[in-house]
Amino acid sequence: APSGGPLVQHALQALLDMVKAGKMTLEQLVQKSAHNTATLFQIEDRGYIREGYWADLVLVDLNKPYTVSKANILSKCGWSPFEGHTFSSTIEHTFVSGKLAFSNGQLIEKGAGERLLFNR
């Protein structure tokens, strides 16, 4: 059976919908999803936009709705509980370790990431 995390692809969009609904600020979203993760797991050189850190960035159009369909699911499992749901934002580009990994709905460079290093 194919594996894959069916929630991962749309996690940021789900959180951005919470921002739009006033449940948290954009700053809180960044704190909880990037900064706290890097700090909690003691991941070296990630989770912040700082000189010398890896550029893991997502560029989002906050005003462009995105509907999840079977055709645009990238997870290996091939399904999502969000299928048919329309999010208020669209992920335009994703950079992993400074390399363009996703652009305009398409994976660009498979395996663009670098091995994580931990301070523990």
Question: Where are the predicted features?
Answer:
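His/Asp/Glu-enriched, well-ordered alpha-helical/loop segment
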Residues: 1-64
